[in-house]
A protein has these predicted regions:
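Bacterial N-terminal signal peptides
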Residues: 5-15
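Aromatic- and histidine-enriched alpha-helix N-cap/loop-to-helix transition segments
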Residues: 96-100, 150-161, 214-225, 247, ...
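Long, well-ordered core segments of solenoidal/helical folds
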Residues: 104-117, 181-198, 249-268, 320-336
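Terminal, non-catalytic domain-edge segments
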Residues: 20-98, 229, 233-254, 280-287, ...
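N-terminal carbohydrate-binding/catalytic regions of secreted carbohydrate-active enzymes
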Residues: 86-157
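Intrinsic, low-complexity N-terminal interaction/targeting segments
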Residues: 62-65, 69-71, 118, 123-125, ...
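Alpha-solenoid helical repeat scaffolds
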Residues: 111-114, 169-172, 195, 233-236, ...
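Eukaryote-skewed repeat-based solenoidal scaffolds used as protein-protein interaction platforms
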Residues: 167, 175, 179-190, 203, ...
Length: 395
């Protein structure tokens, strides 16, 4: 074959995009006494008290279950159920006073941990928890303590919202048990909040990436939204005592401050947020092996939605929203969606794999991860539509 023919073949061949392993995800650090001593500064006492309380509650959770199991066999864990777990939020108000809804509420009460929270992925339409039965489903293994008390997958928040709807239909003494469980659940969230306003994914703390401030899957945003509604004492939350409402308001305000403090500045310009931020330093961190340090478009969009709901936003909030919306506009892909992750420096899409490798093209990661994770999202589109109206009101 002639040199000219080879050149023609090469010219006709489809272009192959440049692909490379950009690096490897470094697992985030848990919250420890050593880190508090070296990194907490003037807030050291508050952080140590937080860690001590977390450990005490964890020990109490485990001791309670162990006591129930002493001296005999115990039931298997409840089956796994994803989604809303049988706790619908869109039924007519009267439905929440029916026997069907009350059974769900009774299931919720029975699975509430001694610390006041709930695990995830339990079928709330199923039987109530039996003595000695685990607080979580088989999802993490028969004896696993993973996610015993969490805000992941909207756990705890969904249970609290459901209890509020049920008690609203039972204003007399028969609804008191649900109101008491609700108050314990809100107290759980208040206990879980870090001194700087952040929230971990799991509480009491279990270490690893779970200790990071978790924006992933809107966990943080969902907590703050609920706390703001509790603080307002309207509708289903009108029963909330004034003192608890005041604490919820203060917690929500503190959470807003940490949102503003964690917005990523790249090249002197505010952008979006990462899925997780270190509890102490607020620096961006990774999570699971395939979730690197990167700007997260969906989570950033949800945080912007939360900030835009604030009445009379401060100049700092307005600046954060303007910058975040501008970043989403700049990073939209030609097809009209967004990559889930963007490199903080280059603003190019990045993709992670289970071996912690970070890639610049989805084709380079394993088939299992390509098909088993949502690498492209559309959530920012809704946020930008909201932003257009929100910004117009300030003109």
């Amino acid at each position: 074959m002639s040199r000219a023919a080879i050149c023609l073949l090469l010219a006709a061949a489809p272009a192959v995009p440049y692909a490379a392993i950009l690096g490897y995800m470094t697992p985030p650090q848990p919250l420890t006494e050593a880190r508090i001593a070296s990194e907490a500064g003037a807030e050291r006492a508050a952080w140590q008290a937080y860690l001590d309380r977390s450990r005490t509650l964890l020990e109490a959770d485990k001791a309670t279950l162990a006591a129930e199991r002493a001296g005999g066999p115990y039931p298997d864990a409840a089956p796994h159920k994803g989604g809303a777990g049988g706790m619908p939020s869109n039924r007519p108000a009267a439905w929440y006073g029916t026997p069907e809804a009350r059974h769900v509420a009774d299931n919720i009460l029975s699975f509430q941990t001694p610390a006041g929270g709930w695990g995830k992925n339990v079928d709330r339409t199923g039987p109530v928890r039996q003595r000695g039965q685990h607080y979580v489903s088989f999802d993490g293994g028969r004896e696993s303590w993973n996610f015993v008390g969490t805000i992941d997958n909207n756990a705890t928040i969904t249970e609290l919202r459901f209890l509020a709807r049920v008690q609203a239909q039972l204003p007399g003494t028969e609804g008191q048990v649900y109101r008491a469980a609700f108050a314990r659940g809100v107290r759980y969230l208040l206990n879980a909040q870090y001194p700087n306003g952040g929230f971990p994914q799991i509480y009491p703390l279990q270490g690893g990436y779970h200790d990071a401030i978790t924006y992933n899957d809107d966990a943080f945003s969902n907590v703050v939204q609920l706390l703001r509604e509790v603080a307002a004492r309207q509708g289903d939350y009108a029963f909330v005592p004034e003192a608890l409402a005041g604490e919820s308001r203060a917690a929500a305000e503190k959470a807003i401050r940490v949102i503003l403090a964690t917005q990523i500045v790249a090249g002197g310009v505010r952008t979006g947020w990462c899925q997780q931020h270190d509890a102490l330093t607020l620096a961006a961190v990774g999570a699971r092996n395939f979730e690197p340090i990167a700007l997260a478009s969906n989570e950033s969009a949800r945080l912007l939605q939360l900030l835009m709901q604030l009445p009379d936003p401060s100049a700092e909030v307005v600046a954060a929203v303007d910058a975040g919306a501008a970043w989403l506009k700049r990073t939209a892909l030609p097809v009209g969606n967004w990559a889930r992750f963007y490199d903080v420096q280059t603003m190019q899409p990045v993709f992670g794999d289970r071996d912690r490798s970070i890639h610049d093209t989805i084709d380079e990661i394993s088939e299992e991860r390509r098909k088993g994770y949502g690498w492209f999202v559309t959530g920012p589109e809704k946020a930008l539509k909201t932003y257009a109206s929100w910004a117009a009101k300030r003109l």
